[in-house]
């Protein structure tokens, strides 16, 4: 009997990865990371693939330049990617510009079997056919094939120099036009501050920034199309509720700094059982005695505390999460499943979509399961973030009724 034919339609793979750690220990981590990434490519065999990276180049971009070049070269020329004969790479390497630098890197790969792929020129306001492999870096501001913005400094005044922002590209694949937005939102600067209120002050800052991005991508300047927003949203569990749940029967001890009287540590102890310490909380310490709670059943019992997306429920959709929190994993190359005791584990890395993009995916979901939302490298050290991906198919003809609207056929 002949082998089963591949599912019809155009296979799409969207991956988000905060890769800051990879450039701090390139020898060990990059090899692992690339092997696991290639495995996902091999499994899902996408025709169109997007990889959105945050903290590209690590904490010190200047020192990591050679590692960056090597990583990009490896991705573009590796054996695993040899069937992808067209590529676009956009790297924000302008690290000397506090005003503009976002440390975002966006990679787009097109399979040789894929015909007629177009990318939108935001300046000329028309689609252009994608040919060859091109890398753009340094000043992305002058590249007409994308829009890049860094969030205004007053969004996060505590942070002297934040690199948070977003990059948007627009594509036409299989007669479907969509925006792909690479995003990096603000983190929780202090566990103690995050614990004080529910929702936390930080979630309010992320809410404001994400609202700004969504307003930008559907404003009047360009025709509205479906969109996928994927990156490091830095969404955190509602800290106050989590601590109350994890430490229901605990008593709390407050430790203050002798000179300022400022709270520097909270210690939660069991009321009995020799007053065993359950949780220690400091600005950058979240040490819970039993990490298994974040791994049992992939941590899904904690999803009730993952509330930040609910504000956008009419504008952003997400498939059900069935993988464990994607951050903060140990950066020890021998530890693949261990979390660091720095933050409460959370689903920071996500692939979100507009309601119309959701329709596109659901149209494609036939009797066979062709949609997968998961993380990469569950048992291998991938750095402090596990990459997260969405694999789906655009069903044949899914975009046809709209083909005349977004004028994919009117190209240069």
From Swiss-Prot:
Domain of life: Eukaryota
Keywords of the record: Cell membrane, Cell projection, Hydrolase, Lipoprotein, Membrane, Prenylation
Keyword Cell membrane: yes
GO annotation, biological process: negative regulation of phospholipase C-activating G protein-coupled receptor signaling pathway; phosphatidylinositol dephosphorylation
Propeptide: 410-412
Reaction(s) this enzyme catalyzes, per UniProt: 1D-myo-inositol 1,4,5-trisphosphate + H2O = 1D-myo-inositol 1,4-bisphosphate + phosphate; 1D-myo-inositol 1,3,4,5-tetrakisphosphate + H2O = 1D-myo-inositol 1,3,4-trisphosphate + phosphate
S-farnesyl cysteine lipid attachment residues: 409
Keyword Cell membrane recorded: yes
A GO molecular-function annotation: inositol-polyphosphate 5-phosphatase activity
Membrane topology: Lipid-anchor
Compartments, record wording: Cell membrane; Cell projection, Dendrite
Description of post-translational modifications: Isoprenylation at Cys-409 is required for localization at the membrane.
The protein's enzyme class: hydrolase
EC number: 3.1.3.56
Its biological purpose: Phosphatase that specifically hydrolyzes the 5-phosphate of inositol 1,4,5-trisphosphate to inositol 1,4-bisphosphate, and inositol 1,3,4,5-tetrasphosphate to inositol 1,3,4-trisphosphate. Plays a crucial role in the survival of cerebellar Purkinje cells.
Family: Belongs to the inositol 1,4,5-trisphosphate 5-phosphatase type I family.
Protein name, as recorded: Inositol polyphosphate-5-phosphatase A
Taxonomic path: Eukaryota, Metazoa, Chordata, Craniata, Vertebrata
Name of the gene: INPP5A
